[in-house]
């Protein structure tokens, strides 16, 4: 199982921990989409920035 993560809000005015989570997920700009493996580490990063991203589950890797 994999997760398709899309950034929907910008990073201006966010806390450093949130910016670090977005960077480690590989998101830099609004509208950018990445696919990441579904694991507890990625889920925790998504939880930190859940108000700035949209997440979909996709089959495969």
From Swiss-Prot:
Q: Name one GO cellular component term.
A: cytosolic large ribosomal subunit
User: Which residues are in coiled coils?
Assistant: none
Give the highest taxon in the source lineage. Answer: Bacteria
Quote the SUPFAM superfamilies the UniProt record gives: Ribosomal protein L30p/L7e
Keywords on record:
Ribonucleoprotein, Ribosomal protein
What the entry lists under InterPro entries is as follows: Ribo_uL30_ferredoxin-like_sf (IPR036919), Ribosomal_uL30_bac-type (IPR005996), Ribosomal_uL30_ferredoxin-like (IPR016082)
PANTHER family linked: LARGE RIBOSOMAL SUBUNIT PROTEIN UL30M, MITOCHONDRIAL RIBOSOMAL PROTEIN L30
What protein is this chain from? Large ribosomal subunit protein uL30
């Amino acid at each position: 199982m994999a997760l398709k993560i899309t950034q929907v809000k910008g990073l201006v005015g966010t806390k450093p921990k949130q910016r670090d989570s977005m960077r480690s997920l590989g998101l830099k700009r609004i509208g950018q989409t990445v696919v990441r493996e579904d694991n507890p580490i990625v889920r925790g990063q998504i939880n930190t920035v859940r108000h700035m991203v949209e997440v979909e589950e996709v089959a495969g890797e």
